[in-house]
């Protein structure tokens, strides 16, 4: 099976709901990124960043990296 690398269907849901990615991918590290936060530019194949707004809703398509 092809490994999923992005989750466009999660835009607009809460970070808590989006953490279901963990059920699809074992060993993945979820990082929630609040508005105005700085993130490193490094790439990690086991990391998914959830960019959220003030309401904790995902604002960008989560993806591997």
UniProtKB/Swiss-Prot annotation:
Any one Gene Ontology molecular-function term assigned to this protein's record: serine-type endopeptidase inhibitor activity
Any one biological process term the GO annotation gives: response to wounding
Keywords in alphabetical order: Protease inhibitor, Serine protease inhibitor
Site entry: Reactive bond: 41-42
Pfam annotation, one family: potato_inhibit
Family matches, as InterPro entries: Prot_inh_pot1, Prot_inh_pot1_sf
Regions crossing the membrane: none
Biological function: Inhibits subtilisin-type microbial serine proteases including proteinase K, subtilisin BPN', subtilisin Carlsberg, subtilisin E, A.oryzae protease and S.griseus alkaline protease. Weakly inhibits pronase E. Does not inhibit trypsin or chymotrypsin.
Similarity field: Belongs to the protease inhibitor I13 (potato type I serine protease inhibitor) family.
Protein name: Subtilisin inhibitor CLSI-I
Naturally occurring in which organism (per UniProt): Canavalia lineata (Beach bean)
Taxonomic lineage of the native organism: Eukaryota, Viridiplantae, Streptophyta, Embryophyta, Tracheophyta
């Amino acid at each position: 099976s092809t490994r999923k690398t992005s989750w466009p269907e999660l835009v607009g849901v809460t970070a808590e709901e989006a953490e279901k990615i963990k059920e699809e991918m074992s060993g993945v590290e979820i990082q929630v990124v609040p508005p105005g936060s700085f993130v490193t530019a490094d790439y990690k194949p086991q990391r998914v960043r959830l960019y959220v707004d003030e309401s904790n809703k995902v604002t960008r398509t989560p993806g591997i990296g």
